[in-house]
């Protein structure tokens, strides 16, 4: 639901957008009410900087995903080079880092073959699909990851395309078990429409993502009032409706919340998903102004 606030997660060209250093953190609880439902924690730091007369930005991001017996951690460094083009600024960026995927094989429900029919266990001890135990914490595999993208922004609209997991890393758990990470294409864009009374700003946006096997689309309409309060609605074609809220607590400090309600069969099992984020923008070095547009996603 918060894709417009954390664009460098999927497009490194959007890192360091604006004139401020930024710290961003979020925590998401997916599908509450379902046992062992996924949980995602995300953290990032980014900063623009100037070298001579050229404009750059760099950052780092970390994500920790837990879903059932799986745990996924990723750490990436991000860089973007930006320059004036037409009425806006074009950024070209890349990120690189590592993905680590763990599986708690010791926690799999193992039963003897004779018990399978009665107890409906998922596996038996001789199941070749299970990776060999890799110690107290199960098994894990790590791979090098690379992504790239372009991003364009003017005073009234923005758009970007990117491709994540260019290396399509294979995470090796054992000689018999491995996980292949598919490359993913993203396209996102939005428009900023200031109403006549100047107090209201409407911000429709959309994002498409696909690994060329499956695909999903996010559609969002956000409104901002008095340069401080934000609220909106979103819809995912994969099957959910989002309610988004946010506000500036003090100058530079933002807090936001998203509630995602399933719009499919999951609604009978889950109370929905909750996401909370906190973002802070600050300026320690006080560089010379570059006259880049102030990002409406981090006001």
Can you say where each PLM-predicted feature lies in the sequence?
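Subset of outer-membrane beta-barrel
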Residues: 1-299
């Amino acid at each position: 639901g918060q894709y417009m606030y954390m664009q460098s997660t999927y497009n490194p060209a959007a890192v360091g957008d604006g004139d401020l250093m930024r710290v961003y953190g979020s925590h998401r609880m997916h599908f509450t009410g379902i046992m062992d439902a996924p949980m995602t924690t995300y953290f990032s730091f980014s900063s623009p900087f100037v070298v001579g007369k050229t404009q750059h930005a760099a950052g780092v991001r970390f994500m920790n995903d837990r879903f059932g017996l799986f745990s996924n951690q990723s750490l990436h460094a991000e860089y973007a080079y930006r320059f004036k083009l037409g009425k806006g600024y074009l950024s070209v960026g890349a990120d690189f880092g590592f993905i680590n995927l763990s599986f708690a094989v010791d926690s799999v429900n193992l039963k003897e073959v004779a018990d399978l029919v009665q107890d409906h266990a998922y596996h038996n001890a001789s199941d070749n699909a299970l990776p060999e135990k890799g110690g107290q914490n199960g098994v894990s595999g790590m791979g090098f990851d690379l992504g790239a993208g372009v991003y364009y922004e003017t005073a009234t609209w923005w758009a970007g395309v990117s491709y994540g997991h260019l290396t399509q890393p294979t995470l090796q758990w054992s000689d018999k078990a491995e996980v292949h990470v598919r490359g993913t294409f993203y396209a996102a864009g939005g428009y900023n429409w200031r109403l006549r009374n100047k107090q209201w700003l409407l911000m429709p946006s959309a994002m498409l993502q696909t690994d060329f096997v499956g695909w999903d689309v996010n559609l969002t309409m956000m409104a901002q009032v008095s340069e401080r309060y934000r609220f909106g609605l979103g819809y995912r074609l994969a099957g959910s409706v989002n309610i988004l809220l946010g506000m500036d607590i003090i100058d530079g400090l933002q807090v936001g919340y998203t509630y995602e309600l399933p719009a499919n069969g999951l609604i009978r099992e889950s109370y929905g998903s909750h996401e909370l984020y906190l973002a802070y923008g600050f300026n320690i070095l006080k560089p010379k102004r570059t006259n880049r547009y102030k990002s409406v996603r981090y006001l």
